[in-house]
């Protein structure tokens, strides 16, 4: 991509009252006058703007960027108000740290986001345990001074993508038009449009959340429940909420039941026929650490209770698996219940 030569630049005018037929004063590309000017004579282009933004004499760009990276990792930025970095926003909790990270980002890291993330996640601050005791809770109730590691619920896209990955369903396909995974009928019903949600076929319905087709007036429901934005307006900062509806989505949404089902198929294929071995494997895949005896006993008990119910009522197993599915049996249906519980664990939907 390159800029047009100066002789190809077009004239730009202010449209009086927004009417493109009534041209007002001529305008030229430049930055707002309240900022320091771009030090260049003549016409200014995108390269000039990029160089101006990354000028080390005013590290606002670097400070804003590292603050957003910090928020993604720790749950809150050093300046909590990501959307307002000025005098009307909240003051930084660690001014010197913010300055040092910005300097590191501009100089040693040469604006590399990957290097900056590595610096943060390899720090002793990030690598702390997120468990809290009464003493720490009293001294630092909101963890503003990082008395413990971060504990942050995953974003809407991350919750879905992680469940797809754990179940083995996720598609690595990249690019292309938006996809339409399963969602309840009637979401798109509107009096002014005959458009319908047409569920994608094959691997397209298991692609990452960033590829989901988004209609501003009828957003993908499970995403909005987990604070995904409607995109009707620009959102500079997402506020995380915790509501009972979120648990109802991951427990009962048809898409998440399907993920739990394929998770169970994966465990039966990759682990031994021993149920406890399958549960151990599933827990480790989902959480990244080995299950303890207490949690194993709880999940084993859940499996036994579900198996008893499905043995008494085979139709319930059919509802869980599907009548024409080769895995249609009480044992697999019971494992689906366990897998659904694992995908809903706090350790899975929360970054600890």
Over which residues does each language-model region extend?
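Primarily short, surface-exposed interaction patches in extracytoplasmic proteins
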Residues: 1-201, 232-238, 251-319, 329-330, ...
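A structural supersecondary motif
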Residues: 213-216, 224-234
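Short, surface-exposed polybasic-aromatic patches that bind anionic ligands, especially phosphate groups
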Residues: 338
């Amino acid at each position: 991509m390159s800029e047009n030569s100066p002789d190809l630049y077009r004239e730009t005018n202010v449209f009086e009252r927004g009417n493109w037929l009534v041209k007002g004063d001529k305008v030229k590309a430049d930055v707002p006058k309240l900022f320091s000017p771009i030090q260049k004579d003549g016409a200014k282009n995108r390269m000039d703007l990029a160089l101006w933004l990354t000028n080390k004499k005013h590290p606002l760009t670097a400070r804003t960027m590292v603050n957003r990276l910090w928020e993604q990792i720790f749950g809150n930025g050093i300046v909590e108000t990501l959307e307002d970095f000025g005098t009307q926003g909240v003051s930084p909790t660690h001014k010197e740290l913010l300055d040092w990270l910005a300097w590191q980002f501009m100089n040693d890291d040469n604006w590399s986001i990957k290097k900056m993330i590595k610096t943060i996640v390899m720090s002793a601050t990030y690598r702390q345990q997120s468990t809290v005791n009464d003493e720490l809770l009293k001294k630092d109730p909101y963890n503003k001074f990082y008395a413990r590691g971060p504990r942050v619920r995953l974003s809407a896209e991350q919750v879905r993508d992680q469940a797809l990955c754990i179940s083995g369903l996720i598609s690595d396909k990249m690019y292309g038009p938006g996809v339409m995974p399963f969602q309840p009928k009637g979401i798109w019903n509107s009096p002014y449009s005959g458009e319908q949600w047409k569920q994608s076929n094959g691997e397209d319905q298991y692609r990452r959340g960033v590829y989901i087709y988004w209609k501003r007036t009828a957003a993908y429901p499970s995403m909005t429940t987990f604070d995904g934005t409607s995109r009707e307006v620009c959102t500079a900062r997402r506020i995380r909420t915790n509501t009972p509806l979120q648990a109802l989505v991951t427990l009962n949404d048809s898409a998440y039941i399907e993920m739990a089902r394929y998770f169970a198929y994966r465990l039966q294929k990759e682990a031994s026929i021993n149920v406890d071995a399958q549960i151990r494997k599933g827990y480790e895949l989902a959480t990244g650490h080995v299950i303890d005896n207490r949690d194993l006993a709880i999940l084993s008990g859940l499996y036994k209770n579900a198996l008893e119910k499905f043995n008494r009522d085979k139709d319930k197993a059919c509802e869980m698996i599907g009548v024409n599915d080769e895995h249609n049996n009480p044992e697999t249906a019971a494992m689906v219940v366990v897998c659904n519980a694992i995908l809903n664990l706090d350790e899975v939907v929360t970054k600890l």
